[in-house]
Amino acid sequence: MAGGFRPYDQDSCPNLTNSEAPEFSMSVVCKTEPHYFHPQTAILPSVQYSHPYHHYLSQFAPNFVPYYYRLLSRPIMKQEEMDIENYINYEVAAQQTMMRQRTLKPLGQLQIQMPPPIIVNQPVKPVPVKAVPVRRSSPPKRRVINAQLVAVATASGGIKNIEPRVEPLPRLEESFKQQVAKIQKSQHHYEQLFGRLTSMLKTLNQRYDNDAEDVPAPPSKRPRHMSTSSSESHIPDTASEKDEKDTLVQYPHRVQKEDGSAVYVLGPNGTQITAHQYGEVFWTNAPVATRCLLCVVFSSDELATHTLTGKPSPAFYGRERPPKLQLDQRKVDDIVVCVRNRTGGKERVIRATITTKCADTAKKYKRRAKKAQKVAIKEEY
């Protein structure tokens, strides 16, 4: 059919082509496009025919009325263009699909995002790798630990027993059994003795460190009633004991010499030390003061080779060692008197401290001797 609708205009087409009279004619001659072409009124390029479109329409369809005749204004005809609404709807649908996929399969937050590949125009040169020669050493030797060969198969397939032949032990003699019994008996005795000594040393150490309370004194022995004819024997000598106590209270006593130096007399036996030595003694408690006075009055050699009583130690019963010498009892008594008057300690605590000090000094000398022997052996090698 013809292109866009144009109202009939007598001015635009005054003459008909093949006939002068306005009658029906089938000859149609296409004319050129006029200069007033409007793109909104035609989809295709408009073509001017010899007769108007409505003239032919009235001839073939006299009762046909186009729908746009009923409108107030004629419709605007546009050429085919891009549908913006469909394009927007397509983009929205694509975004919704992508969000739905992410919701169903969320990406991990800690997923490592790899950077985009770097496009290198130049070819990558391979880095030369130096070949490292592999050292083929001999396999490690097998170590066999605690292996015992029990049997070996012979050439014929039999099993040969190779258990070592152990000679039977000789019969035990009766004298040997008696010696073993004696050793067991003495060992039991030593265990009991060492147990007592360990507890005693522990108690002495606690007393020396003032960690334990004073143990009550052992009960006094029952008085022995001796029958005598003199009635004076039953009267205690209170006067002599009181005079002795008064005499001992004055110690330690400071004495000024003619040359101007001062000395201290520790007890009634006349044991003396200088004022400087007396000032270096710590009088905090009885054990500490006793050890300080022992180091001043006696030398280290005397303390290592002497004991308080000079008797062999019961700890070495059955294997007695040579007994040590006894310390000078006069000096020991002066030390006991001095410490008792200054600290108020008990005599048995002071004497126990003297025994411990002698043992400690002897151990110190033994350790020094062993150390010197080791050094001498190293020098020889």
Curated annotation (Swiss-Prot):
The gene is Elba2. GO terms for cellular component: chromatin silencing complex; nucleus; polytene chromosome band. GO terms for biological process: chromatin organization; heterochromatin boundary formation; negative regulation of DNA-templated transcription; negative regulation of Notch signaling pathway; positive regulation of neuron differentiation. This is Early boundary activity protein 2. Residues 210-245 are annotated as: Disordered. The BEN domain mediates DNA-binding. The keyword Repressor applies. The keyword Repressor applies. GO terms for molecular function: chromatin binding; sequence-specific DNA binding; transcription corepressor activity.
